[in-house]
From Swiss-Prot:
GO molecular function, one term: 4-hydroxy-2-oxovalerate aldolase activity
Name of the protein described by the UniProt record: 4-hydroxy-2-oxovalerate aldolase
Domain Pyruvate carboxyltransferase: 8-260
Reaction(s) catalysed (UniProt annotation): (S)-4-hydroxy-2-oxopentanoate = acetaldehyde + pyruvate
């Protein structure tokens, strides 16, 4: 693989995807410290919202320590060069949430849908584009459909006004060949002015390899997270990825030592538990399950005595997608009852 001379825009997820790993309990002080550290390291884009995007505060998705608006208003005035993005999932976030984020100074809106449901993004993408901001279409769980279907959905988002389309490996399921195929087709068939991005998870230990494959295939933007802080086994660990890019001659504009220090001195001490490929996170990737389901399954294991791994495998078998978190407890309860009935029958 020869990537020498290529450049890429990196996008940090530690303060949005990382909210999943922190049960959305990141303080304003922590948020500002990490964001300003990333800013000083040269990170061009930082995402800040509830883990499930603008308006995610709910019983279903979790109550954060502070509102999206409080986080955004605390961080954005402190940044000198980095721009802030906000994730929005139609059905969770509304146009009013979008307008609030822009009023706070957000520069990029990323509208996320399941990979087969791009049509629900039309209103939000159209509004963001009308308001003149960098507008990204974000196709989640993209491993579940063919490259041709991803392209079909991407073209819908492009037609609504998105100037960048992401192929998103929400489950950390993809291997490099699949990433190359899907990113390569998007790059070949979308408007040349439309950027292509890739968002990976490390559940199979492939996030860095997949991100490199995406760059080789034509991706201009790559998501990651300092120290990997994110759902499941985390996102592409950015300090490691920057080092790999530096060795391969890929220009990121990031100060390697400074981002290493942000990871080690600020993010790792914040972690509630190590972000690693443990058996449950590995099961997410192997079974193709939405990464933010991990902590829900582990909580259900403690409550009902059913293995989180068994819950995750069954969720994968049923083809569950992001937004179906409420099914996890129902499934665990059903599995516990079935096990109890088996004991009685025996």
């Amino acid at each position: 693989m020869n990537l020498h001379g290529k450049s890429v825009i990196l996008h940090d997820m530690s303060l949005r995807d990382g909210m999943h790993a922190k049960r959305h309990q990141i303080s304003l002080e922590q948020m500002v410290a990490v964001a300003t550290g990333l800013d000083q390291a040269g990170m061009p884009l930082i995402e800040i919202t509830h883990g499930d995007g603008l308006g995610g505060r709910s019983i279903n998705y979790g109550f954060p320590a502070h509102s999206d608006e409080e986080y955004l208003r605390a961080v954005i005035p402190q940044l000198k060069q980095a721009k802030v993005s906000a994730l929005l999932l139609p059905g969770i976030g509304t146009v009013d949430h979008l307008k609030m984020a822009l009023d706070c100074g957000v520069s990029t809106i990323r509208v996320a849908t399941h990979c087969t449901e791009a049509d629900v993004s039309e209103q939000h993408i159209g509004m963001a584009r009308k308001l003149g901001v960098d507008t990204v279409g974000f196709l989640m769980m993209a491993h579940m459909i063919s490259a041709e279907k991803v392209l079909e959905q991407a073209k819908l988002m492009e037609s609504y006004g998105a100037n960048c389309i992401y192929c998103t490996d929400s489950a950390g399921y993809m291997l490099p060949d699949e990433v190359s195929e899907k990113i390569g087709l998007l790059r070949a068939e979308l408007n040349p002015a439309t950027e292509v991005g890739f968002h990976g998870h490390h559940n199979m230990g492939m996030a860095i390899a997949n991100s490199l494959a995406a760059i080789e295939a034509g991706a201009a933007r790559i998501d990651g997270s300092v120290a990997g802080l994110g759902a499941g086994a985390g996102n592409t660990p950015l300090e490691v990825f920057v080092a790999v890019c530096k060795r391969m001659g890929v220009e990121t504009g990031i100060d390697l030592y400074k981002i290493m220090d942000v990871a080690e001195d600020l993010v790792v001490p914040m972690m509630d538990q190590p972000i690693r490929v443990d058996r449950d996170a590995l099961t997410l990737g192997y079974a193709g399950v939405y990464s933010s389901f991990l902590l829900f399954a582990q909580r259900a294991e403690k409550k009902y005595g059913v293995s989180a791994r068994d819950i995750l495998v069954e969720l994968g078998r049923r083809g569950t997608v992001g937004g179906q978190e409420d099914m996890i407890e129902d499934l665990a309860l059903d599995m516990a009852r079935a096990r109890q009935q088996q004991k009685v029958s025996a």
